[in-house]
Swiss-Prot record:
Impact noted for substituting residue 120 to A: Decreased protein abundance
PANTHER family: CYTOCHROME B561-RELATED, TRANSMEMBRANE ASCORBATE-DEPENDENT REDUCTASE CYB561
Encoding gene per record: Cyb561
Positions of L-ascorbate binding: 79, 83, 152
Protein name (Swiss-Prot/TrEMBL): Transmembrane ascorbate-dependent reductase CYB561
Length: 250
């Protein structure tokens, strides 16, 4: 029975592989869109703006999605290692997204454009702040010494819920930004099936598909990482060992 509970569900590897194929395709199509129709990327030129969508797709979509899947993919590895990988992927995603934010604000400043007036920018700042807060709270509960098993168990459902919600919010914000970029450049020509518009629409569909597949994997209760009897909290607060609580699956 123990071997059965620790075995990998038959369909899980295929869904994970499909999610990675979609995620890499999203990044590649984003690069193709920026390269073919927006002139590529550069920091010290008018192409600086293009750093923003590329960084946001890599950080807030692809890497954030992969961070959420860590506990589904690494089912038998030590919980300590899995936690650290989960946290590091979120750190990388945050840093890359921060570069994207700096790029767009710096570009606007150089061009004399207004900041934070569109729905996309409002949603973007909100999701970025929520993402940072989610990481800080998650670090405090699951990696920082001091939190007990019982406290972690009470917070874990909220952490999982808000993690999935922020990811969904990130995908929606990316779609808003994509549409905004197309309308600014193409205007009324967007309705004439311009090649750039068609490619960007395909990118939007790929973003949705990636988000749906990641959330579907997370939603399957029997695909959660099984609890291991030997798993202990990363915290060095030894009094938790006497509280009688045990880790729960994620």
């Amino acid at each position: 029975m123990e071997h059965s509970s620790a075995s990998v569900p038959a369909a899980l590897p295929y869904y994970v592989a499909f999610s990675q194929l979609l995620g890499l395709t999203v990044v590649a199509v984003t690069g193709a869109w920026l390269g073919l129709y927006r002139g590529g990327i550069a920091w010290e030129s008018s192409l600086q703006f293009n750093v923003h969508p590329l960084c946001m797709v890599i950080g807030m979509i692809f890497l954030q999605g992969d961070a959420l899947l860590v506990y589904r993919v690494f089912r038998r590895e030590a919980k300590r290692t899995t936690k650290i990988l989960h946290g590091l992927l979120h750190v990388f995603a945050f840093i890359i997204a921060l570069v994207g934010l700096v790029a767009v604000f710096d570009y606007h400043k150089k061009k004399g454009y207004a900041d934070l007036y569109s729905l996309h920018s409002w949603c973007g700042i909100l999701v970025f702040v929520l993402y940072f807060v989610q990481w800080l709270v998650g670090f405090s509960f699951f990696l920082f010494p001091g939190a007990s098993f019982s406290l972690r168990s009470r917070y874990r459902p909220q952490h999982i819920f808000f993690g999935a919600t922020i990811f969904l919010f990130s995908v929606g914000t990316a779609l808003l930004g994509l549409k905004e970029a197309l309308l600014f450049k193409l205007g009324s020509k967007y309705s004439t099936f311009e090649p750039e518009g068609v490619l960007a629409n395909v990118l939007g569909l790929l973003l949705v598909c990636f988000g749906v597949v990641v959330l579907y994997i997370l939603a399957q209760a029997d695909w959660k990482r099984p609890s291991q009897a030997e798993e202990q909290a990363l915290s060095m607060d030894f009094k938790t060992l006497t509280e009688g609580d045990s880790p729960s699956p994620q």
